[in-house]
């Protein structure tokens, strides 16, 4: 049997676990010493809290800040709790403003106060600017570290100015052009700067189309869509007065896309994407029990409707055997539509303008699948129980449930979005209740009428 080739991360984790299990803490600290902060963060998320407490003090203070911005919130809270106020300040004071803005809300007040005292006035103002916007908006996502020039200078002057700076912000692919009041006018691409003549004026080379600004209040989901559509590396951010307030870079957008993907998966079962995989048992139990309670309520709703047909079930035991088939088929069909529509809304591909067309299409798909699978299930039922009426009843119930499931799966995300409720979080449990109830009522109701 061929051996499975391990990834670099799996090898690093395996070696780290061996050292920790052998209580060889010095070796464990040495193994992660030369790793990138992102790799260290991933390893810390993959080990138990007690092992993190051993490893964390061995990581250089200058690296700890970079690691803190990469780990999820649960792990971040634990690591912050392991640090003194002085160490927290030293670890975070050199971070980019946007990264610092993400961490500050999770720091103790004493650490925040000390940190603000270490920042110069300009840095402090930039941090306050970002914190004034919602965390999930373009303003909360942006970095205030960018380069601006005036439109009435030459390329030669711009290049001279950049040389005086000696260092450019990370992911700088364009320089922003502003007037004296800091109103955004456009951008000057670095490629243009390097290829045009030195006496060319900036205003004649300003690019207004490729770098349309993003409003600071724009939701981060829409920001991610704009970056995808325009193939952006960075984008300017403006306020309601068209004044340049920051820029968003591709690394921030990658984080948004990753977080949204994790949220979509985790929220479907009531979990938080920032939950620590190795969180204490009672903490994890407390978080999950709420969702289990909600599921229990919906289960009893379905049981109530089944109870209405108790006499019918007593007359024919085969109904009880086949009930899960009807509910399961509707649940799967509805979930398929729910995910398609929820994802479409998140990416901006589904709106009120085209939802009617999509609902019609999903109902048609479920109708076709309903016909195909009702025939298959009807034949299996007839072969199993030799009962023609029972076969017809389950076939009709399957078609009914699949049609209702498709309509519900398409309509629910829209309705929940209108109510400001995350469809990825609440849609699944509501849909399951609908398909279970409709499936059971259709199947048992038809059975009561015809059998």
Predicted regions located by residue number:
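Hydrophobic packing positions in regular secondary-structure scaffolds
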Residues: 1-268
């Amino acid at each position: 049997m061929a051996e499975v080739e391990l990834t670099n991360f799996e090898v690093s984790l395996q070696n780290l676990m061996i050292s920790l299990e052998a209580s060889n803490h010095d070796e464990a600290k040495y193994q992660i010493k030369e790793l990138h902060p992102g790799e260290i963060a991933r390893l810390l998320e993959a080990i138990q809290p007690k092992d993190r407490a051993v490893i964390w003090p061995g990581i250089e203070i200058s690296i700890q800040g970079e690691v803190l911005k990469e780990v999820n919130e649960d792990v971040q809270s634990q690591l912050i709790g392991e640090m003194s106020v002085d160490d927290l300040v030293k670890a975070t004071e050199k971070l980019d403003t946007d990264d610092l803005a993400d961490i500050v809300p999770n720091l103790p007040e004493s650490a925040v106060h000390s940190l603000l005292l270490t920042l110069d006035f300009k840095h402090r103002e930039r941090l306050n600017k970002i914190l004034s916007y919602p965390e999930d908006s373009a303003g909360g996502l942006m970095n205030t570290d960018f380069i601006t020039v005036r439109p009435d200078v030459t390329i030669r002057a711009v290049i001279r100015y950049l040389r005086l700076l000696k260092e450019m912000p990370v992911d700088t692919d364009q320089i922003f052009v502003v007037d004296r009041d800091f109103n955004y006018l456009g951008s000057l691409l670095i490629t243009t700067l390097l290829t045009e003549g030195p006496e060319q004026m900036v205003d004649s080379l300003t690019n207004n189309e490729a770098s349309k600004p993003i409003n600071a209040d724009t939701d981060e989901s829409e920001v991610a869509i704009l970056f995808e559509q325009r193939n952006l590396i960075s984008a300017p951010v403006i306020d309601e007065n068209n004044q340049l307030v920051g820029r968003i870079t591709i690394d921030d957008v990658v984080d948004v896309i990753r977080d949204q993907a994790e949220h979509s998966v985790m929220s479907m079962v009531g979990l938080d994407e920032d939950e620590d995989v190795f969180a204490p048992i009672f903490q994890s139990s407390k978080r999950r029990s709420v969702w289990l309670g909600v599921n229990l309520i919906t289960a009893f709703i379905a049981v109530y409707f089944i109870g209405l047909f108790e006499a019918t079930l007593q007359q024919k035991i085969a109904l009880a055997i086949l009930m899960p088939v009807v509910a399961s088929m509707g649940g799967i069909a509805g979930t398929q539509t729910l995910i398609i529509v929820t994802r479409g809304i998140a990416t901006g591909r589904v709106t009120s303008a085209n939802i009617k067309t999509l609902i019609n299409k999903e109902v048609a798909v479920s109708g076709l699948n309903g016909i195909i699978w009702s025939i298959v299930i009807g034949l299996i039922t007839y072969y199993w129980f030799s009962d023609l009426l029972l076969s017809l009843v389950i076939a009709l119930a399957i078609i009914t449930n699949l049609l209702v499931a498709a309509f519900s799966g398409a309509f629910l995300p829209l309705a929940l979005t209108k109510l400001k409720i995350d469809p990825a979080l609440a849609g699944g449990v509501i849909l399951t209740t609908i398909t279970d109830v409709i499936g059971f009522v259709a199947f048992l109701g038809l059975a009561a009428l015809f059998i």
